[in-house]
Amino acid sequence: MHYSVLLQESINDLNINPQGIYIDATFGRGGHSKAILNRLTTGRLIAFDKDLDAISYARENFQFSNFEIVHASFASIYDYCLQHSLLGKIDGIIMDLGVSSPQLDNAARGFSFTHNGPLDMRMDVSKGITASQALEELSVYDLSYIFKVYGEERFAKKIALRIKDYIQQNGSIRTTLELAELIRATIGKKEKKNPATRCFQALRIYVNNELKDLEALLENILAVIKSGGRIAAISFHSLEDRIVKQKFSALINPKQELNRITKMLPQDSSQIKLKWITKKSKANEDELNQNVRSRSAILRVVEKL
């Protein structure tokens, strides 16, 4: 079962205009898209996803005249809006970042460290290298960097060395449980979390270019959204959330850091591009009981001035 995290909170905070144009940057299985469509009359929704399974699901289950699904990363939203004369005309954007439940639950996709499957991890299986190929191609230094920066893994170098040594002896790491067991054997079980959690996250982020795609979307988001339009971002780990928070904060108070250092007067209000609608919201107890994966979700919502 796929549950859209923080569904009501995010849709309510978008303050849907029934005649508006909206973008679901991460369609998944359409939970947020369906909720938006239910509030539209003459408005329309454009959804994006890199995953071909999500595209197929949308085409089979979302046959609405005011809905369009685009097989592309959300990093291409600006280009899409430019090509379709939609810059500055979008009433709202929702982004539900990270991996979806169907991707995690399908062992064949290679995202899970508890179900065995090919070590793939690509959200778009039509292109790019698999996680298995990445482990073979990356150096110890690069692999250690990825685990440390993208996974915040304390034992990054130790794990990277063990992986490269294993590959040298065995040729490759082909399955998810093969990698998960190798990580567990390297560092042991030192906490409640599965010891493979951070490295799997890091490898997935690298394979799918997730953080760079997020930065590309946020870099041009002001040109896409109209005045009074809102942006809702749901993140699941500190790296994503930090990027979202810093970008939003920079557009809400562009000279905040400079003011703190130089004691300058507050900036001209014309430099402020956004305002907070929801600075930080987390799942309530009912949602946590229904969906354990919602425990790390953070919702931030802003409005363009």
UniProtKB/Swiss-Prot annotation:
Keywords: Cytoplasm, Methyltransferase, rRNA processing, S-adenosyl-L-methionine, Transferase. InterPro entries: RsmH, SAM-dep_MeTrfase_MraW_recog, SAM-dependent_MTases_sf. One of its GO terms (molecular function) is rRNA (cytosine-N4-)-methyltransferase activity. Gene3D superfamilies: Putative methyltransferase TM0872, insert domain, Vaccinia Virus protein VP39. Its EC number is 2.1.1.199. S-adenosyl-L-methionine binds at G30, G31, H32, D49, F74, D96, Q103. Its main location: cytoplasm. It is an enzyme of class 2 (transferase). It catalyses: cytidine(1402) in 16S rRNA + S-adenosyl-L-methionine = N(4)-methylcytidine(1402) in 16S rRNA + S-adenosyl-L-homocysteine + H(+). The keyword Cytoplasm applies. One of its GO terms (biological process) is rRNA base methylation. It is found in: Cytoplasm. One of its GO terms (cellular component) is cytoplasm. It comes from the Bacteria. Belongs to the methyltransferase superfamily. RsmH family. Specifically methylates the N4 position of cytidine in position 1402 (C1402) of 16S rRNA. This is Ribosomal RNA small subunit methyltransferase H. It comes from Francisella tularensis subsp. holarctica (strain LVS). The gene is rsmH.
